[in-house]
Amino acid sequence: MKKLLPILIGLSLSGFSSLSQAENLMQVYQQARLSNPELRKSAADRDAAFEKINEARSPLLPQLGLGADYTYSNGYRDANGINSNATSASLQLTQSIFDMSKWRALTLQEKAAGIQDVTYQTDQQTLILNTATAYFNVLNAIDVLSYTQAQKEAIYRQLDQTTQRFNVGLVAITDVQNARAQYDTVLANEVTARNNLDNAVEQLRQITGNYYPELAALNVENFKTDKPQPVNALLKEAEKRNLSLLQARLSQDLAREQIRQAQDGHLPTLDLTASTGISDTSYSGSKTRGAAGTQYDDSNMGQNKVGLSFSLPIYQGGMVNSQVKQAQYNFVGASEQLESAHRSVVQTVRSSFNNINASISSINAYKQAVVSAQSSLDAMEAGYSVGTRTIVDVLDATTTLYNAKQELANARYNYLINQLNIKSALGTLNEQDLLALNNALSKPVSTNPENVAPQTPEQNAIADGYAPDSPAPVVQQTSARTTTSNGHNPFRN
């Protein structure tokens, strides 16, 4: 036990260390693939459908049965004194020679199993897409919260500086009020961003069953975009490989086969039967033997039988014709479903194609928007310092900058998700696509809102020190200096 204790401690520590490491996209997906209940249910349904093929095949194979019987008879009244013991055993063999309905049932089950297999493949692709979407939603929520925190710090600095300028009489109180209003707005946005991050983490947990303290973040420096193939080429590939379209085609084939199965109700059946049996009967009692000799003889018999059983349905009240019509109507419905699936695939491919191109354009546009917004903010701050711009201009420029950064991050994640969407529409989405995205990830980031954007109660309390409804402060000739370093209230005057 003393030797095992260090090993157990080491295993426990290694388990904690593995949990503390950042998980990447592939690791998260592997955990989802192993633990996702919906995918596991789909796999069980597929296995059950294929196992049912053996059940459908069994009526076509020989049916062998063994029977045994024992009967004891005790006579009374006129049969008083006559008792008997009867024992019998038989072996029966039945082989279907011609029964088209049984062959058709086997074919139907094979097609149904094929549909279930396609359903499982669809669920696999859905899990890949949902896992990646939830993963990138978490990263996007982290970015939004980070930018909101940075915007809050920037607005706070502007609020601090504006208050100090107001204290020395350089600006009007409306500038302070505008800065405070903007700061309160950012605080509200921060609450929303924190909540969105918590919800995104919970959505990922719902898929994988695990919480992740850290996730590998997107490598923005090496982020690249690729234009998709021409839409006509994508549509041709989707025609061949889209799983929804394939499932609709298989369902149409199944409905066609069900028409043939209903028509087989008019066909005859022919079965071969063979049996062998023995029986033994013995008598006892006072009346089983008379004066003239034995009246009830014991018997021991055996018998072999071979025969053919033929059946031809002539009229069944119109049931077969009704079943044929029902199957024909079901085939029409399956055909319409195939057309609907085809239109849906075309729409999905074209929409995904357009979304990818739009994401690429948005990324390029927001990159330039960030650069322009930063230049505008620098110009506004310089103009405000010399009195040619107002604090409203500075606040608007700050908001524009951080909104552009958030939109740029959102466009990047939308591009990645749209890449997976179009592969899913083509029916080619697999783990290799996740591996390619996984290579675009880099350093870990925390998923805890407190680590992404620590709460600033002291800063908020300082900001709350100024009440817009309070009387205007007395102007004092004091030097403008930053007071946040020592924790004093810059709005106390």
Swiss-Prot record:
Give the chief site where it resides.
membrane
Q: Which GO terms describe its cellular component?
A: cell outer membrane; efflux pump complex; MacAB-TolC complex; membrane; outer membrane-bounded periplasmic space; periplasmic side of plasma membrane
Q: How is its activity regulated?
A: In vitro, inhibited by hexaamminecobalt(3+).
The sequence repeat boundaries are: 23-230, 231-446
Q: What happens when the gene is disrupted?
A: Cannot grow on efflux substrates novobiocin or fusidic acid.
Signal sequence interval, chain numbering: 1-22
Where is the sequence biased in composition, kind Polar residues? 272-287, 446-459, 475-493
Enumerate the Gene3D superfamilies for this protein.
Outer membrane efflux proteins (OEP) (1.20.1600.10)
Q: Does the keyword Transferase apply?
A: no
Q: Where in the cell is it found?
A: Cell outer membrane
Write out the transmembrane intervals: 63-74, 83-96, 269-279, 301-311
- Residues annotated as region Disordered? 270-298, 446-493
Q: Which residues lie on this side of the membrane: Extracellular?
A: 75-82, 280-300
Phenotype for R389E: Partial channel opening. Increases sensitivity to vancomycin, by allowing its passive diffusion across the outer membrane
Q: Which GO terms describe its molecular function?
A: bile acid transmembrane transporter activity; efflux transmembrane transporter activity; enterobactin transmembrane transporter activity; identical protein binding; monoatomic ion channel activity; porin activity
Q: Which protein family is it in?
A: Belongs to the outer membrane factor (OMF) (TC 1.B.17) family.
Q: Fill in the domain comment.
A: Forms a continuous, solvent-accessible conduit: a 'channel-tunnel' over 140 Angstroms long that spans both the outer membrane and periplasmic space. The periplasmic or proximal end of the tunnel is sealed by sets of coiled helices.
Q: What does this protein do?
A: Outer membrane channel, which is required for the function of several efflux systems such as AcrAB-TolC, AcrEF-TolC, EmrAB-TolC and MacAB-TolC. These systems are involved in export of antibiotics and other toxic compounds from the cell. TolC is also involved in import of colicin E1 into the cells.
Recorded protein name is Outer membrane protein TolC
Look up and give the organism this protein is from.
Escherichia coli (strain K12)
Q: Which gene encodes it?
A: tolC
